[in-house]
Amino acid sequence: MKKKAQPAKVSYFFGPGWNDLKTFIKKFWEFTQEDIKKRAEKVEKGKGVMSLSGAASLLSCFSLILFGSLFFLAIAFTVSLILGLIFLLVYLLFFLHWISDRIHLIRNKIFVACPSCKSKYFIPTYICPSCGARHSDLTPGKYGAFFRTCQCGKKLPAHFLLRRDRLEAECPNCGHSLSGTGNRPLCVPIIGGRSSGKTAFITAFSCEFIERVAPRNGMEIQHYNKENHDFYEKVLRSHYLHGTSMQSKEATDIKAASSVAFSFMVHHKKMKPDRLIQIYDIAGETFVNNTENELQLHYTYSEGIVFVLDPLSIPSIRNRLDEGISEVDKSSVGTLDVDLVLDSFLNKLRQITGHASGDALDIPIAVVISKADIRTVDEFIGDEKISAYLSQNGLDMNKYTAVEDRLCREFLTENGMAHFVNAIDMKFKNNRYFKCSAIGHSRERGRYNPKGVLEPMEWIFQTTDNGMKSIWHDSEFEKL
């Protein structure tokens, strides 16, 4: 496939150099022809070829034609060979620069994940800060090994060592503005039915991680862009402080993304490159009804999946609700069948990744039972239940999450969800169960007091990213 021409000046060694060689050979041949022509004219003006001097001039002319041509060929060949070897060496150096750039991207798992169309690229479209020209392949090559000269004369870095990622960039597919193009993305979709608690989970995790986990572990946070910063301050943080939540909205504009990403970058002096955390949220109705405006391509490169399961969507639990539950919480009971949500998700995974229906997937999945502060649920999987299990079996607190995992599985199995547990085990090689209360109390009763929202994400990061594991290891994820 032919590469698109770039708005830049071609390197001397990929065009102008060969043109100069052709010009040299042409001029040298013209000089040789001119010399032969002069000798021929001298023969014509002489005493004739029958005279001694005329015969000598004719012989000299033939000698010039023969030896001049041979000399021309020898010089042209020698110059072409020397320059060809020099150019070949330069091409090898250019190739090594390109290889080093690509190895850096692959080894560090650096790529561009567009939060809008979900497309994945090694290299985005970079924008010249001087003239706004768009460069879709800003890598070492025919336009330069380390720098590329834009059509406006501005020199642009074409290698990761020169911090190419500091340039403004956009998605080559949809034109969406991009940030953190030199970072390693950690993409985690949060899936679940309507009113399962996905958005509250995202709100609680984002605020807890940014304001508590990051400072405690020496991480520096940078928001993806101004839009994400404003969304965090005016929406997520506002809900966090007031104990409210919002429903994920179905995208009514067919040009708008159905799955919305909240993104921020994490920097730590011991972790290279920086991480770009992208948390995806999608409305339950859109997810189950298969009415997304875009292919959910991020499933192909996600670090893990968080499946939020509303225990109140389980009939046996819903029928045993304690009378103390508030009307607000009653109105937010998930109505979608958990098996239907799981089937929809698995169908999408097969459609996008091409996996056969019988294949077990490598991607880790954290099944999170939400609303665990409700008394009916707490009786099965609450802290007291876990502590009692630890005590009865002589286990220390390092086994807390392992016991949590076991009790959550037993809770679902005992309440008619054995088929769901079996399906997760069959379809996902690496799975773990958690409980959480994103708000920590009934909605609209004050600031969030979340419990259990950090552990699922920490487990995913520890499982897939040694860099994050080295700087964030608040919990132990052992097995019984």
Where are these regions (language model features)?
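Conserved GTP-binding G-domain of TRAFAC-class P-loop NTPases and closely related GTPase folds
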Residues: 303-480
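Hydrophobic alpha-helical transmembrane segments of integral membrane proteins
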Residues: 55-96
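Short, flexible loop/turn elements at secondary-structure junctions
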Residues: 192-194, 266-270, 283-286, 369, ...
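Catalytic micro-motifs at enzyme active sites that drive phosphoryl/nucleotidyl and oxygen chemistry
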Residues: 175-177, 248-254, 263-268, 291-296, ...
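Short linear interaction motifs
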Residues: 94-96, 168-173, 181-187, 258-259, ...
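Basic, amphipathic N-terminal segments
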Residues: 1-58, 87-148, 154, 479-480
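Switch II of P-loop NTPase G domains
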Residues: 254-268, 272-306, 312-323, 448-451
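Conserved G1/Walker A P-loop phosphate-binding module
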Residues: 101-149, 154-255, 267-277
